[in-house]
Structure formats: structure tokens, C-alpha cells
């Protein structure tokens, strides 16, 4: 098992998570005793204990006082916060993960975009007004796109959508910088922003779902043209597009 880590705690965490992912510690199984596991990984018991607590908070493990530590089925117990970890564990499946991420984001964003234009049209107009000073670079578009989604999610009347976005912020930011490296993708997005601004100024939230659906289809086609050339480094938390 080859693991790149910045320190003992990071190494221990990645070792345990990868062992769970590769079914060496399958769901429902009991982890080795603390002393045995610390010797196996090569870290102190204090470091291991801290790592186990962190993994339990993320849903990978179940820790109960006086009982052995049990491995959870993370698909049932974890949240969006492990997306980064899954991307790191399964780089070969990363393009499919991104497909699923973008599909989920498109479906959810149609709800909070409509809600924002209905409940806070002035806020929508204000944030959309920034497109007229937007630099034609991948970084600027990726940053603005996230800002737009974050602002409209918060203004939709249901701030829980913001927490959903926060769950895959790092992953989406890296993918976004790659996606918006395409001039065609930037132009497609800019056209969408302009049409959305028109709806916001007219306080027309009724037509938002149709606009979102059209943009979702077109941006999906654009993504399919770009995904096969996506650098594998994007899957890593410190990867650069």
C-alpha cells in the first residue's frame, strides 16, 4: 500500500480509510486492538486515538466506550465531507464521481436559483451584475460561479443548500478551474449568467427551471467533450488544474 502523507496522523488516517475502502476492514468488522493497530501502522497510540475519533466523526467508524471499534458502512453513515477522500481513494473512478457531482448540483441548484429570484430578486440582480466586470480567465469564472451559487443558495429561503454546497467546495473548485479553462465553456456560462440576470431584473422566477434545464444540458455536453482530458491530479486535494 503506497500512501503519501504529510505526517504520522495523516498517514494513519489514510491507512485506515484505504483499508476500509479496499475491504481489508470491511463494514461491520472490528478493528484490531489499539496497541496492535498502532504497531501495524507505525504510530503512537495517542496519535492513533486522535485519528480514530476523527474518523468516527466522519462516519467511517463507530466508537463506543468499553466496546471494540467497529467499521461502518460509510455509504450509510457519512456525509458530503468525505467526497474529497473518495476522490483521493479512487482516481480511476473520479470522472464518474464528477459526473454524479455535477448532475446532483444541477438538480439542486434549479431549486435554490428559483427560490432566490422569488425571495431575494435584488440580491440576485446585485451578484449577477458582477458578470460585466468578470475577467475572461478560468480562475475568475470558477470563483464567480461558486460565489453565484453560494449567494443564491443563501438567499433562497433555505440556507441548508449552502451547507450542501460547502460539502463539495474544494472538489468543485478544482473541477471548475479545469472546466472553465475552455473558452467555449466560459462563453456558454456567460450567456447563461446574462439570461439569468434578465430574469432577475424582471423578478421572473417562473422561467428559471427551464433556463437551468437548458444550461444543464448544454454544459453537460460541454463537459463530456472535456472530461477525458482532465488531469488526474485534480482528484487529489492538493492537485492543480
Curated annotation (Swiss-Prot):
Alphabetically, which GO biological process terms does the record hold? fatty acid metabolic process; regulation of fatty acid metabolic process
**Annotated keywords:** Activator, Cytoplasm, DNA-binding, Fatty acid metabolism, Lipid metabolism, Repressor, Transcription, Transcription regulation
Q: Which GO terms describe its cellular component?
A: cytoplasm
Pfam families given in the database record: FadR_C, GntR
What GO molecular function terms would the record report?
A: DNA binding; DNA-binding transcription factor activity; fatty-acyl-CoA binding
Q: What does this protein do?
A: Multifunctional regulator of fatty acid metabolism.
The molecule here is called: Fatty acid metabolism regulator protein
User: Which species is the source of this protein?
Assistant: Shewanella sp. (strain ANA-3)
Phylogenetic placement of the source organism: Bacteria, Pseudomonadati, Pseudomonadota, Gammaproteobacteria, Alteromonadales
Amino acid at each position: 500500500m503506497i500512501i503519501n502523507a504529510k505526517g504520522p496522523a495523516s498517514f494513519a488516517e489514510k491507512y485506515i480509510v484505504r483499508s476500509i475502502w479496499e475491504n481489508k476492514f470491511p463494514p461491520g468488522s472490528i478493528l484490531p486492538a489499539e496497541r496492535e493497530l498502532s504497531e501495524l501502522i507505525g504510530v503512537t497510540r495517542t496519535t492513533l486515538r486522535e485519528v480514530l475519533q476523527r474518523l468516527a466523526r466522519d462516519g467511517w467508524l463507530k466508537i463506543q466506550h468499553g466496546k471494540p471499534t467497529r467499521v461502518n458502512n460509510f455509504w450509510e453513515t457519512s456525509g458530503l465531507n468525505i467526497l474529497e477522500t473518495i476522490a483521493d481513494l479512487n482516481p480511476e473512478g473520479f470522472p464518474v464521481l464528477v459526473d454524479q457531482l455535477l448532475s446532483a448540483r444541477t438538480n439542486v441548484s434549479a431549486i435554490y436559483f428559483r427560490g432566490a429570484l422569488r425571495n431575494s430578486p435584488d440580491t440576485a440582480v446585485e451578484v449577477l451584475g458582477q458578470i460585466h466586470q468578470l475577467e475572461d480567465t478560468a480562475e475568475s469564472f470558477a470563483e464567480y460561479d461558486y460565489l453565484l451559487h453560494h449567494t443564491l443558495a443563501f438567499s433562497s429561503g433555505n440556507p441548508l443548500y449552502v451547507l450542501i454546497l460547502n460539502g463539495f467546495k474544494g472538489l468543485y473548485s478544482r473541477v471548475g478551474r479545469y472546466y472553465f479553462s475552455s473558452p467555449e465553456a466560459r462563453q456558454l456560462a456567460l450567456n447563461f449568467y446574462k439570461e439569468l440576470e434578465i430574469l432577475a431584473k424582471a423578478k421572473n422566477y417562473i422561467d428559471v427551471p427551464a433556463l437551468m434545464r437548458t444550461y444543464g444540458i448544454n454544459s453537460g455536453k460541454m463537459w463530456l467533450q472535456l472530461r477525458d482530458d482532465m488531469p488526474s491530479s485534480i482528484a487529489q486535494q492538493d492537485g492543480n488544474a
